[in-house]
């Protein structure tokens, strides 16, 4: 189900935002197409939207809808065929002792403290590192779908928190933050491998990773997980030769 007119909720409406500065490509303007009303977007409907290239931030369900750019490609890992690189095997073996526990979405001050440390070191100056519990709650905790908060602990110490959505055909990776001060750690890589393992446990074929942008260093890690499919012209196809895909502006 990758076409909007295939969605079961015919009462959904879509609007396009005004232009705003792109978070990933310098000197570019972005726009989003937003699905509304949010209370109609349950797990089944959201699963169809994800197949059509949408994702969510809190209760806000959107996809890129820019005027002169198609660089954002929705991507998903085909988990049963996932072939690990040597560095990914090292990450799995190094961190597999982490204890993962799944919860319904909830606020905890330990999670928030870890989130602030992560933002301060990984995304300093981006606005997300400001001390605002309300912003944190609004960004991560609202959901109308089957969402889980996953804690990863090492000898009782909180190392990572990941928000995931369980969909009819896969898991959607919503957001992850982790301890930025552990030397040599590769928590982010391990998290994706854990989510892929969880897909296999649930007999779900895909792990949705959001958007991949060829010219964004923030997004480069996603291309390391193969086989990777991208939604191109309404069809999911294998992402192979990366140089063949668009950078940004169309003529």
Swiss-Prot record:
GO biological process, one term: ubiquitin-dependent protein catabolic process via the N-end rule pathway
GO terms under cellular component: cytoplasm
Keyword Cytoplasm: yes
Sorted UniProt keywords: Acyltransferase, Cytoplasm, Transferase
Subcellular localization, as worded in the UniProt entry: Cytoplasm
Enzymatic reactions: N-terminal L-glutamyl-[protein] + L-leucyl-tRNA(Leu) = N-terminal L-leucyl-L-glutamyl-[protein] + tRNA(Leu) + H(+); N-terminal L-aspartyl-[protein] + L-leucyl-tRNA(Leu) = N-terminal L-leucyl-L-aspartyl-[protein] + tRNA(Leu) + H(+)
Family assignment from sequence similarity: Belongs to the R-transferase family. Bpt subfamily.
Protein name: Aspartate/glutamate leucyltransferase
């Amino acid at each position: 189900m990758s076409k909007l007119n295939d969605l079961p909720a015919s009462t959904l409406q879509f609007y396009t935002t005004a232009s705003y500065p792109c978070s990933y490509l310098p000197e570019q303007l972005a726009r989003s197409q937003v699905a509304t009303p949010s209370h109609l977007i349950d797990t089944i409907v959201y699963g169809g939207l994800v197949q059509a290239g949408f994702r969510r931030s809190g209760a806000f369900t959107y996809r890129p809808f820019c005027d002169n750019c198609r660089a954002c490609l929705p991507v998903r890992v085909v988990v049963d065929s996932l072939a690990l690189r040597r560095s990914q095997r090292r990450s799995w073996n190094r961190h597999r002792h982490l204890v993962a526990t799944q919860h319904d979405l909830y606020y905890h001050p330990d999670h928030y403290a870890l989130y602030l440390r992560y933002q301060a070191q990984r995304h300093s100056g981006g606005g997300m590192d400001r001390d605002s519990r309300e912003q944190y709650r609004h960004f991560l905790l609202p959901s109308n779908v089957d969402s889980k908060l996953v804690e990863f602990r090492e000898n009782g110490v909180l190392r990572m928190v990941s928000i995931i959505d369980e969909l009819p055909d896969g898991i959607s990776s919503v957001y992850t933050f982790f301890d930025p001060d552990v030397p040599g750690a590769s928590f982010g890589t391990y998290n994706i491998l854990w989510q892929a393992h969880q897909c296999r446990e649930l007999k779900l074929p895909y792990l949705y990773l959001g958007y991949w942008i060829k010219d964004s260093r923030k997004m480069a890690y996603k291309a390391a997980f193969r086989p990777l499919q991208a939604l191109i012209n309404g069809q999911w196809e294998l992402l192979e030769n990366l140089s063949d895909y668009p950078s940004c502006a169309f003529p």
